[in-house]
Amino acid sequence: LDLGSGSGEMLCTWARDYGIIGVGIDMSQLFTERAKLRAEELGVADRVEFIHGDAVGYVADEKFGVAACLGATWIGGGVAGTIDLLAKSLRTKGIILIGEPYWRQLPTTEDAAKGCLANSISDFLMLPHLLASFDDLDYDVVEMVLADQDSWDRYEAAKWLTMRQWLEANPDDDFAKEVRTTLTLEPKRYAAYTREYLGWGVFALMAR
C-alpha cells in the first residue's frame, strides 16, 4: 500500500522487479492517470491498482505486508499520525516505510528554514531525534536509505533542465515569466539552503 503514490513509479517498478501486488492512492488525478500509464508501459497493470482519492484516513479492506508513505506525512498530520494510519492497513510483522526530510544541520534562523521551503525549524527533526521518535512510538528501525548531496543535486537539477526546455518550447505561455523567475532563482536558493541544511531518508519500521 502506498499512500500519496504520485506517478506510481515505486509500485510499478517493484511489481516488475519483485512481482509484488500493490495499491496506490493519490489525490492528483493527473498523477493517478500517469501511474496507470506507467503500469501499462511496464506490463504490470494486472498487479497494481491506482486509485484517485484522498489518502487522509484511508484504511485498506485487506492487510498489506508493506505500507508506505514517502514524502507525504501530512496525510496523517505528521510522522506519528501517518505511522498510526499505515499500521491499520498492515499485516502482523509487516513493514512500514516512511519517507521524511530531516535537518542535516539545524538552521541558524527561521529565514534559513524557510529557504529550505519549510514553514519553520520545528517542521523537521535532526536525524538522531527522528530515529528516536520511532523508538518512542515502539517501532524498530530495521533499514534506512538516505539521500546524499549528490543525489539531491541530481533530483533538483533535473527540474531546472525541465523548466529550461519548457521555456524554449513555450516562450509565450502565460506562465513563462513565472517559470523564468523560478529557474533563475532556484539553483542559488537550493545551493544556499536545501543542499546544506536538509536531508531526506526512507525508514523501514517494524512494530515491537
Language-model-detected regions and their locations in the chain:
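Short, glycine-/aromatic-enriched active-site segment of Class I SAM-dependent methyltransferases
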Residues: 101-121
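Conserved class I S-adenosyl-L-methionine
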Residues: 1-4
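Short alpha-helix
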Residues: 123-138
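Conserved Class I S-adenosyl-L-methionine
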Residues: 143-208
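A short acidic, Gly/Pro-enriched loop at the edge of an enzyme's catalytic core
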Residues: 59-67
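Class I SAM-dependent methyltransferase SAM/SAH-binding core
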Residues: 7-56
